[in-house]
């Protein structure tokens, strides 16, 4: 709806600007290609400028204090609160999540092969679940579970990550 509104508004301004140039009629004459063509070309950038300004104000409204948005738009207020309050945490969280995912993606390449060997190897099953060979994958699974849980842990993931990666 905002697009239509701005296009109509710009069209009205261009109609005012056109009469000294070519035609006093508000609608373009079919035989005059230039006024019709210019009117079609010009509102597009003008509409984009208006939309840019509108999106900026919308972004500022969302980023700004929730008090303004709470009275104007309830939905925008909720979105703005979640974005603005969680932005600081989410950036750090996403960095940690990316690091954990990189670790998780590199390490499972080893794990499925180990698990596959245990499943394909009949010896552990013949010995029973309490035998020694199945225990190492359980230890690896615990590490994998830590990898999966730490990004969700909030503060804990940073503490866990620093000793694991002393270089970074």
Swiss-Prot record:
Residues 1-91, 108-168 are annotated as: Disordered. This is Putative insulin-like growth factor 2 antisense gene protein. It comes from Homo sapiens (Human). Coiled coil: none annotated. The lineage of its organism: Eukaryota, Metazoa, Chordata, Craniata, Vertebrata. It comes from the Eukaryota. Residues 59-70, 159-168 have a biased composition (Basic residues).
